[in-house]
Amino acid sequence: MNNEKNFLSYMVFILVCLVVMICYSSGIITNISEKIEESSTLAVNANYKSNNLIDDMEKNSEKIIETIKSFNGEKAVSYYITNEIDDKVVYLTFDDGPSVNTRKILDILKKYDIKATFFVVGKEDDESIELYKEIINNGHTIGNHSYSHDYKYIYTSLENYSEDFLRLQRLLKEKCNYDIEIARFPGGSNNTVSDRYHKDIMVDLSKYLIESNVTYFDWNVDSTDANATTMSVDNIIREAIKGAKQFNSPIILMHDAPPKTTTVYALPCVIETLKKDGYEFRALSPDEYVIQFLRAKY
């Protein structure tokens, strides 16, 4: 009798254990099912969002007639292109001069028998006037980079910008008998610093230059020499060459302000490497290849 009771107790214990295990397993299965369903939902949502993003990009791209993209790290930038060319041509551009570095750059350009573009600021000392003249006499192009290069002043109003812009135009005309036909906005036409002083002013300033028959230029290659007061020579060489080789016609942003000594040291290597790669060098012209981040619409 005792054996029967013991057997029944044992069987009850086994049944209880089985029930507990089944319930526990059901919970796990349910949880796994929920996780799978959740993952599937996330995947569907991600695919939906991705498709919507592609649709949005396609819709947006229709608003830009001709664009190219440059990838600098994780940043993608769109450009408007005018007069695209098939030749392999490099356009070296130097902003913020003249300075002691400008003459050194002019000597290098003369050595390699190539032309470039200098987006200058306003300086009226004798040495700077001579440098303006030397740029012109050596067959390079001068562009207007604003007289003051004072973001707060020129980007506060159209009146301030135009006054500053025309001051430099007059200086070059009076001292060098030179008519400036091209320009580059400090920070580029898509700069966001200007919004601190006047929201969306770049549209008005772009229209102003167009109405003044002045072509403004941006760039599609950044040498990164402005990313530090004095960037390393190796970094300038690497970024300039790497960026240039992405394009048939790279417009390279460089600087010849007083601290940019390493730009001078990097320049020969950049020139020699791109020459070996089959590029020729030209100065910018309003009638030739133009790249703009922002294009004003009427």
Q: Where are the predicted features?
A:
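Catalytic domains of cell-wall/extracellular-matrix polysaccharide-remodeling enzymes
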Residues: H149-L253, A257-K275, Y279-E280, P286-D287, ...
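Short charge-dense sequence patches
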Residues: L53-D56, Y79-E84, Y112-E124, A183-V193, ...
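N-terminal, intrinsically disordered, polar/charged segments of Gram-positive cell-envelope systems
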Residues: G27-D87
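Hydrophobic alpha-helical membrane-insertion segments, chiefly the h-region
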Residues: C17-I28
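N-terminal Sec-pathway targeting helices
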Residues: M1-L15
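Active-site beta->alpha N-cap acidic-glycine motif
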Residues: N60-N160, R167-D179, T273, Y289
